[in-house]
Amino acid sequence: EMCIRDRHVVNFTDIQLAIYEKCPHDELTIIMRRYMMKIAEHFADEDKCLGLITGESIGQVASQTMQSLAATNEVCHMPVYRPLIAMDKNDIIDISNKIDTYETSILPYEDCCTIFVAKHPVTKPNINRIKKSEERLNDVIDELMKTAIDTTEVIMVDAE
């Protein structure tokens, strides 16, 4: 049984700002994604889900190299399913058109991937270096994560 009952809209901005201020800029994306996965896993656990599903595809962007996905997975205790993993961009666009998400995906707006993007993001992250960089957040991250989780907006989705 799939556990897709609702959507969680997380205000991640304060976490992003802390990462931006305290961590090496070439590691911004991978560190942000690791904290996003931790938050996603929190809600999946809360909803008694058995895994996370993402829309990543190998090589589409810097954060979707094999090494980057491994670094992202490293923070998760539950399985991460990636049904699009080997599809090319055109296949993914076709699917997004079929499930009526394409038009939303191309809207021009600033999000975490455009505002906090590194000029030269790491594509082969070293997990030990990433963990060392994350230690720079130790004084603030627990409170920031708690606030992000506590202020999350939950949007109920009709099962049909």
Region roles according to the model:
Residues 107-160:
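The feature marks non-catalytic terminal segments
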Residues 100-108:
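A short alpha-helix-loop-beta-strand transition element characteristic
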Residues 6, 48, 109-112:
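A generic structural signal for well-ordered coil/turn residues at beta-strand boundaries
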Residues 10-13, 54-55, 83, 106-107, ...:
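Generic beta-strand/beta-sheet core signal
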Residues 2-4:
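Short, small-residue-biased leader/transition segments that mark boundaries at the very start
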Residues 61-63, 89-93, 105, 114, ...:
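Short active-site-adjacent structural elements
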Residues 6-8, 79:
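Conserved beta-strand segments of alpha/beta enzyme cores
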Residues 16, 21-94, 98-99, 144, ...:
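Active-site adenylate/phosphate-handling loop in enzymes that bind or generate adenylated species
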